[in-house]
Design a protein with these regions (language model features):
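A noncatalytic interaction/capping subdomain that flanks phosphate/NTP-handling catalytic cores
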Residues: 1-138, 142
């Protein structure tokens, strides 16, 4: 296991510890700047295995209709599907997988849905914010 994967294999966000498994160094290179400071030694509550695939052909992306990702949930199982990616997370076991190109967006979209569901079920809340950096400072919108 290379150093970046060791640092990022388990991280904690919003009080929920997640283990991410992926063999592709390029994927870890994408995640390190964003998640490196959240590394944790705690026992993971969730586990997500990521398989990096080739980017979909342009015609697949061009013919994809609808939102970036389609989410569905049935009997404690959350699924995601988009142009060139798909995955499943079983809330009962706390385990899932995601097959996607080397890109943060599918991973982060799926992780956000998993965390949102978990937080809402456990009495937490989910707050979305956006920020803009300008010449006169930073502005955060909730």
């Amino acid at each position: 296991m290379h150093r970046q994967q060791e640092v990022l294999s388990v991280f904690e966000i919003a009080g929920i510890t997640c283990r991410v498994e992926c063999r592709e160094e390029a994927f870890w290179d994408l995640l390190t700047p964003r998640y490196g400071e959240f590394a944790s030694d705690a026992v993971p509550e969730l586990s997500l295995r990521v398989e990096v695939t080739d980017h979909p052909p342009e015609e697949v992306v061009a013919h994809w209709s609808g939102p970036f990702a389609r989410m569905a949930g049935t009997d404690g199982v959350l699924s995601i599907e988009g142009a060139g990616f798909r995955g499943i997370f079983d809330e009962r076991t706390g385990e899932g997988w995601l097959s996607q190109p080397c890109d943060r967006s599918p991973f982060e979209t799926f992780l956000t849905a998993i965390y949102a569901g978990r937080l809402l079920r456990e009495g937490g809340f989910f707050l979305h914010a956006a920020g803009i950096m300008a010449g006169n400072g930073a502005h955060v919108f909730f």
